[in-house]
Design a protein with these regions (language model features):
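PRPP-associated nucleotide enzymes
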Residues: 2-188
Length: 188
């Protein structure tokens, strides 16, 4: 592979980090992929780190040791969070959102990738310092948000269903007392 310019390397490093949040990526991977020395890659990473930090888009952390490397931790600055909260509140206050039963219609919001990806980054930021193994959600409406939180944390998503499907492999089932109906129900 031909030598790439610094701009090209910075773009590729940023793309790989953003597509793999909270995953440790060794410098060897970048060095081999970009056909550049580790010292050159380290200089490129400094640029990526500074720009993402300056724009409050995330942090690039260095992990020391044999299994070390760098990882990207997505984040939003406080101004961006406030703006997002305001936009979300405005959307929720739109006329016609109250449906029979005095519920708020949320489907269009819960399935909007631009909204849910931001909400996922914000929610994940509250768990970034914890040692979380999985993100768990109950099927259906919560899946997009739980997926985005799991993606931001770099961990797996577990979906709890009322009925298991044979194509999903091994399952664990529990009985629980429903808070709304007061009956014993089962979920897998």
């Amino acid at each position: 592979m031909e030598k790439l310019s610094r701009n090209n390397r910075v773009v590729i490093i940023t793309k790989i980090l953003v597509e793999n949040p909270n995953k440790v990526i060794g410098l060897n991977r970048f060095s081999e992929l970009l056909n550049a020395a580790k010292s050159t890659i380290s200089e490129d990473i400094v640029i990526v780190r500074e720009v993402l930090d300056k724009l409050d888009m995330g942090k690039v952390e260095t992990i020391s040791g044999a299994a070390g490397g760098i990882k990207f931790i997505p984040q939003m600055g406080s101004n961006a969070k406030e703006e997002f909260a305001k936009e979300l509140c405005d959307a929720l206050m739109e006329e016609g959102r109250i449906v029979p039963g005095n519920f708020i219609y949320l489907t269009d919001i819960m399935y909007n990738p631009q909204i849910i990806s931001k909400a996922g980054v914000i929610l994940a930021s509250y768990f970034k310092s914890m040692d979380v193994d999985y993100v768990v959600t109950v099927e259906t409406k919560g899946i997009p948000l739980a997926y985005e939180v799991a993606k931001s944390l770099g961990i797996e998503l577990v979906i709890i269903r009322r009925e298991n499907k044979v194509t999903e492999g091994p399952t664990v089932s529990i009985n629980y007392l429903s808070g709304t109906s007061g009956r014993i129900q089962q979920m897998s």
